[in-house]
Amino acid sequence: MSADSTVKRRRLEPEERRAEILAAARKLFDAGNYASVSTSDIAKAAGVARPLINHYFGGKRELYLEVVRQMMVVPAPVTESLPKTTREHRLAISVDRWLDVVERNKRTWLTAIGPEAIGRDPDVERIMLEADEIAADHVLEAALMTDIVEGREELRAMIRSYGSMLRAASREWLIRGTLGREDLRAFLTDSILHLLNVTYPKVLAATRDGRTPPE
């Protein structure tokens, strides 16, 4: 009897089954790495027959890319149901929630942003670009700035750049241990607030004057 046939199966709706496979894959990739995890491992952990992984995702690589996407695209709950309070408070809460997500999925997240992420292929790069755009949307939402029109593209560009700094700073926390979580939370919160409250208005004023912002 094959390993696939001995798996206990529960009857689930397709979306529930897909989510269950994703959750199992995320845990396995977080505990190991892309090369060390097989589709058989994932099928066993998810309680499904191996062909179902191909049915829902196409194969191990496609499943891994979806896991990467889940890790890199800032989840909606990070900015959902924020209190109707100040920009500072809302952004501090969002940063704290985001750190929770990264801490829970440390290894998978680090692999996704690292050079070993299946060769840093174009699909991973595409996911990173998508993640940057969605993160910019979430920052604007948390900062109560979704209606900004003037200088919007420049503002989004600065927020995307902040995202790159955020990833580098998070590696200092998770890998080097040079920053504690509270240090990182304060650094990330203060940095985005300075960008929105000081840098963006300065760039906007310079653009209105038709000149380059001073050094």
Residue ranges of model-derived segments:
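Short, structured helix-loop boundary elements
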Residues: R18, T39, R61, L65, ...
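Pre-recognition alpha-helix immediately N-terminal to the DNA-recognition helix
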Residues: E20-L28, V74, I93, R97
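Helix-turn-helix
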Residues: E20, A24, L28, G32-E62, ...
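Alpha-helical DNA-contacting segments of helix-turn-helix folds
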Residues: Y64-M71, A112, I127
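N-terminal intrinsically disordered/low-complexity leader segments
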Residues: M1-E16, K202-E215
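Hydrophobic alpha-helical connector segments
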Residues: E66, E80-R107, V149, R185
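Amphipathic alpha-helical packing segments from all-alpha helical-bundle domains
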Residues: A76, P122-T146, R156-A168, D183-A186, ...
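Amphipathic alpha-helical segments used for helix-helix packing
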Residues: V102-R126, D137-L140, A168-I175, L204-A205
